[in-house]
Amino acid sequence: MAFRENVLEILEEITETEEVVQNTNIKLFDEGLLDSMATVQLLIEIEEKLDITVPVSEFDRDEWATPEMIITQLEALK
């Protein structure tokens, strides 16, 4: 499975909706699909499944607002 699909699969699991796959520009926080607890869960899943550690200093909610932005940020950290 490609990196992009892996990230979207993780997001779909965390948010419990396919909407994140269908609309990769959806504002996850504004739509209530991610909150602080879900964000922690997301970062743990990313580390476990993709072997990418996201330093807390690198996490800026404004830069991680959509699935597309998350994919871009993670590609930079690979």
Swiss-Prot record:
<dbReference type="Pfam" id="PF00550">
    <property type="entry name" value="PP-binding"/>
</dbReference>
<protein>
    <recommendedName>
        <fullName>D-alanyl carrier protein</fullName>
    </recommendedName>
</protein>
<comment type="similarity">
    <text>Belongs to the DltC family.</text>
</comment>
<keyword id="KW-0961">Cell wall biogenesis/degradation</keyword>
<keyword id="KW-0597">Phosphoprotein</keyword>
<keyword id="KW-0963">Cytoplasm</keyword>
<comment type="function">
    <text>Carrier protein involved in the D-alanylation of lipoteichoic acid (LTA). The loading of thioester-linked D-alanine onto DltC is catalyzed by D-alanine--D-alanyl carrier protein ligase DltA. The DltC-carried D-alanyl group is further transferred to cell membrane phosphatidylglycerol (PG) by forming an ester bond, probably catalyzed by DltD. D-alanylation of LTA plays an important role in modulating the properties of the cell wall in Gram-positive bacteria, influencing the net charge of the cell wall.</text>
</comment>
<dbReference type="InterPro" id="IPR003230">
    <property type="entry name" value="DltC"/>
</dbReference>
<dbReference type="GO" id="GO:0036370">
    <property type="term" value="F:D-alanyl carrier activity"/>
</dbReference>
<keyword id="KW-0596">Phosphopantetheine</keyword>
<dbReference type="InterPro" id="IPR009081">
    <property type="entry name" value="PP-bd_ACP"/>
</dbReference>
<comment type="pathway">
    <text>Cell wall biogenesis; lipoteichoic acid biosynthesis.</text>
</comment>
<dbReference type="GO" id="GO:0071555">
    <property type="term" value="P:cell wall organization"/>
</dbReference>
<dbReference type="InterPro" id="IPR036736">
    <property type="entry name" value="ACP-like_sf"/>
</dbReference>
<dbReference type="GO" id="GO:0005737">
    <property type="term" value="C:cytoplasm"/>
</dbReference>
<dbReference type="GO" id="GO:0070395">
    <property type="term" value="P:lipoteichoic acid biosynthetic process"/>
</dbReference>
<feature type="modified residue" description="O-(pantetheine 4'-phosphoryl)serine">
    <location>
        <position position="36"/>
    </location>
</feature>
<feature type="domain" description="Carrier">
    <location>
        <begin position="1"/>
        <end position="78"/>
    </location>
</feature>
